[in-house]
C-alpha cells in the first residue's frame, strides 16, 4: 500500500491505485528531459545554417528556458485553481503544439528573410523554430511544477517523498541520455545541406508520445489535495521568501546551476560537431559523436543521482554540494588547460556504423565527468534554500521555477564568449559559476534570519 500525507494536515491519502499515478509522474519526469534536451543538438543544425554562429545555435535553448521566467508562478497558480491532472493535460497539449511548430520550421520560411542580426540575415524558418522552442518551454515548466510536489505527496513527504523524486530524476537523466544520442545519430555529420527535416522522424515520435501521454493521464485518477475550494481566501504573510538571505542566495544558485548543467554539455556538443579549426578536429560524424558524448554526460547524471539517493541519509546536502562543486571546478580547469591534440577514445554512435570508439580531446572526458557533479546540485541547493522557510516554502518554489531561466541565459552568454575567444576559454564562465555554488555551500546557505516567524 502506498500512502501520502499532507504536511500540517490530518488528511491522508491511502490508495493502492496511487501506483498508477506514481508511474505516470515518472513518465512525465522523463518527458521533461526529452523536450528540454532536443534544443542543444538541434542547435548544431541552426549553427551551421548561420555560418557557425554558436550564439544563434543556442537560441533555441534560450527560448526554451525563457518560458520559465513567464510561466514559473502562473504554473503554480494553475495547480491551486485547476489541479495536477488538468495542468498536466494542458502541458501535454502545449508540448504537442510546440513540437509541431518546430516541425513546421522544416517546411516553411527557408527563403523568407525577416530581419538582420549583426552580420546574419534571420530567415522565417528560424523564427518559427524559436517560437516552437518557446512554446515547448511553457510545457516543460508546467510539467516540472506538477511532477515534483506530486511525487513528494505520493511518497508521503520526507525521505520517501525524496526517494520518489530521486527515482523520477533518474528516469529524467536516462531520457536526457538518449535524446542527444538519437538526434546526433539522425544528423550524422553537419553539412551545408543539413536541415530540420533530417530530424523530423524524432519530432513525429515526440508528438506521438505527447498524444499517448495525454490519453493515459486522462484516464488516471490523480489526488488533488492542493485544489483550492471555492470561497477560500488567500492568506497574507508579513514577510516573503526574499526576506531570508539563504533563500535569496539559493535563488541565485538555482539560476546559476541550471546554466552550468546545460552549458557544459551544450557547448561540448557544439565543440565536437565543429569541423573547423575552432572545433575538436573531428572531420566525420562530428554531430553524431558529439551527441553520443553529450549523452554520456546525462548518463553520468543518472549515476550521480542514484549514488546520491543511496548516501543522502548519511551525507548532508551541504556536504554533497561543497564536494561536487569543488570537484567540478577541478575537472573544468583540467579541460581548459589540456591541449586539443591530447586525445582519448570514447564511445560514439552513427546510424551507419552503430556504436564505435572515437578519438576526442581529453577535455571532452573531463567535461563529461562533470555530469557526476551536477547531478546532485539541484537537490542540494533547493534543500538548503528552503530550510527553515515553513509557510513561505510554496512561494519560494514558484520563484525557483522562474530561475530555471538560467539554463537559457548562461549557455547563451557562454556561446557568445566561444564565438569571440574559443570553446575552451568559454568554460571560464562555468568556473565562475561553480565558484559561486561552492561559496553558497560553505557560507551562503546558513540561515541568518531565524527571528522571522515561519509557522
Name every feature range the model reports, one short phrase each.
Residues 93-121, 327-356:
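C-terminal ends and interior cores of transmembrane alpha-helices
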Residues 161-221:
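Helix-loop-helix hairpin linking two adjacent transmembrane segments in secondary transporters
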Residues 59-77, 295-307, 406:
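Central cavity-lining transmembrane alpha-helices of secondary-active solute carriers
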Residues 39-40, 243-295:
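Extracytoplasmic gate region of multi-pass secondary transporters
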Residues 1-13:
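Short, small-residue-biased leader/transition segments that mark boundaries at the very start
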Residues 142-156, 375-390:
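Intracellular juxtamembrane helix-capping segments at the cytosolic ends
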Residues 20-52, 144-148, 264-272:
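Extracytoplasmic
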Amino acid at each position: 500500500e502506498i500512502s501520502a500525507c499532507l504536511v500540517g494536515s490530518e488528511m491522508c491519502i491511502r490508495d493502492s491505485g496511487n501506483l498508477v499515478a506514481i508511474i505516470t509522474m515518472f513518465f512525465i519526469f522523463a518527458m521533461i528531459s526529452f523536450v528540454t534536451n532536443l534544443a542543444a543538438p538541434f542547435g548544431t543544425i541552426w549553427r551551421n545554417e548561420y555560418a557557425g554562429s554558436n550564439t544563434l545555435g543556442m537560441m533555441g535553448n534560450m527560448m526554451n528556458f525563457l518560458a520559465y521566467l513567464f510561466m514559473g508562478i502562473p504554473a503554480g497558480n494553475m495547480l491551486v485553481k485547476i489541479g495536477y491532472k488538468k495542468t498536466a493535460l494542458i502541458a501535454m497539449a502545449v508540448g504537442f503544439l510546440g513540437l509541431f511548430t518546430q516541425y513546421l520550421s522544416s517546411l516553411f520560411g527557408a527563403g523568407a528573410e525577416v530581419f538582420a542580426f549583426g552580420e546574419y540575415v534571420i530567415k522565417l524558418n528560424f523564427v518559427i523554430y524559436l517560437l516552437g522552442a518557446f512554446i515547448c518551454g511553457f510545457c516543460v515548466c508546467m510539467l516540472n511544477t506538477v511532477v515534483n510536489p506530486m511525487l513528494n505527496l505520493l511518497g508521503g513527504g520526507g525521505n520517501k517523498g525524496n526517494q520518489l523524486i530521486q527515482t523520477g530524476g533518474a528516469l529524467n537523466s536516462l531520457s536526457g541520455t538518449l535524446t542527444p544520442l538519437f538526434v546526433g545519430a539522425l544528423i550524422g555529420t553537419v553539412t551545408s545541406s543539413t536541415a530540420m527535416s533530417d530530424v523530423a522522424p524524432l519530432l513525429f515520435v515526440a508528438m506521438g508520445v505527447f498524444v499517448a501521454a495525454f490519453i493515459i493521464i486522462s484516464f488516471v485518477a490523480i489526488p488533488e489535495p492542493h485544489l483550492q475550494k471555492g470561497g477560500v481566501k488567500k492568506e497574507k504573510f508579513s514577510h516573503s521568501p526574499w526576506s531570508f538571505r539563504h533563500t535569496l542566495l539559493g535563488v541565485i544558485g538555482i539560476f546559476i546551476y541550471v546554466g552550468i548543467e546545460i552549458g557544459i554539455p551544450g557547448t561540448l556538443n557544439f565543440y565536437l560537431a565543429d569541423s573547423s579549426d575552432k572545433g575538436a578536429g573531428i572531420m566525420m560524424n562530428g554531430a553524431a559523436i558529439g551527441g553520443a558524448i553529450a549523452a554520456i554526460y546525462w548518463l553520468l547524471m543518472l549515476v550521480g543521482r542514484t549514488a546520491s539517493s543511496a548516501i543522502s541519509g548519511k551525507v548532508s546536502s551541504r556536504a554533497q554540494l561543497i564536494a561536487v562543486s569543488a570537484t567540478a571546478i577541478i575537472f573544468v580547469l583540467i579541460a581548459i588547460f589540456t591541449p586539443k591534440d591530447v586525445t582519448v577514445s570514447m564511445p560514439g554512435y552513427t546510424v551507419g556504423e552503430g556504436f564505435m570508439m572515437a578519438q576526442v580531446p581529453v577535455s571532452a572526458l573531463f567535461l563529461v565527468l562533470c555530469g557526476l557533479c551536477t547531478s546532485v546540485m539541484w537537490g542540494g541547493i533547493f534543500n538548503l534554500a528552503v530550510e527553515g522557510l515553513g509557510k513561505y516554502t510554496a512561494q519560494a518554489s514558484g520563484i525557483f521555477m522562474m530561475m530555471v531561466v538560467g539554463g537559457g541565459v548562461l549557455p547563451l552568454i557562454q556561446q557568445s564568449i566561444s564565438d569571440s575567444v574559443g570553446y575552451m576559454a568559454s568554460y571560464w564562465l562555468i568556473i565562475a559559476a561553480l565558484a559561486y555554488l561552492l561559496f553558497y555551500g560553505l557560507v551562503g546557505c546558513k540561515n541568518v534570519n531565524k527571528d522571522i516567524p515561519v509557522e
